């Protein structure tokens, strides 16, 4: 992946690699089990009943967004999806779900009208896949948000392999090239087909399949039990 920031410091890379390995290995990952899940998570069999008619309206808007895809270019799809989901309220997992880290499905994000950066990125990824954009053009990308000094997730879009990708970020309404986002330092990225670790000189290392990410597998399993629009 092209570099997000040309000047990477050694100390930053030590921090990032520590973060990356803690996120990649299941032994270091806190996964929500049925026994540990808050009632809010377990009660999602009928989200519209739980959250009311406004939730249904948001889901209908999602359906309309996907239905319009055949008339749109890829860039128009990116712009509309980014704008649509960025209307949702940002809420930390501990406040929203009662757990430290939870990856919500797009349905959960929309019906509850709240989520964090992972939830926004996941929803955009699966929506764009439904709109016909191939998996190898999209990656969920963990970065360090330098201004916030914290881990953050964005969705990146590659028109062709190896080019400077576009960044879809819940903190920024506009879509910019990664090379223009010098506030973001990439750690690793993944999609349904692979997992890549960012390298110091702006390249990347393919390190396996996304099955290594237990939280990803868990959210995909839940999405498969839901009915996408």
State the predicted function of each range:
Residues 5-20:
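Bacterial N-terminal signal peptides that target proteins for export
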Residues 24-32:
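Hydrophobic h-region of N-terminal signal peptides that target proteins for export
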């Amino acid at each position: 992946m092209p570099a997000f920031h040309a000047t990477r410091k050694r100390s930053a890379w030590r921090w990032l690699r520590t973060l990356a390995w803690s996120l990649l290995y299941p032994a270091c990952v806190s996964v929500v089990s049925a026994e540990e899940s808050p009632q809010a998570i377990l009660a999602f069999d009928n989200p519209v009943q739980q959250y009311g008619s406004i939730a249904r309206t948001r889901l209908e808007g999602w359906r309309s967004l996907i239905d319009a895809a055949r008339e749109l270019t890829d860039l128009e799809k990116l712009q509309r999806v980014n704008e649509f989901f960025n209307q949702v309220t940002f809420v930390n997992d501990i406040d929203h779900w009662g757990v430290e880290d939870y990856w919500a499905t797009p349905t959960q994000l929309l019906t509850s009208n709240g989520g964090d950066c992972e939830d926004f990125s996941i929803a955009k990824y699966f929506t764009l896949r439904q709109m016909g954009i191939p998996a190898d053009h999209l990656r969920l990308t963990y970065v360090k948000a330098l201004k916030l000094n914290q881990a953050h997730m964005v969705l990146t879009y590659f028109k062709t392999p190896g080019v400077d990708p576009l960044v879809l970020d819940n903190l920024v309404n506009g879509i910019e090239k990664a090379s223009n986002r010098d506030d973001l330092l990439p750690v690793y990225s993944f999609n349904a087909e692979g997992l890549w670790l960012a390298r110091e000189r702006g390249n990347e290392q393919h390190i396996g399949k996304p099955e290594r990410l237990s939280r990803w597998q868990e959210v995909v399993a839940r999405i498969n039990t839901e009915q996408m629009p």
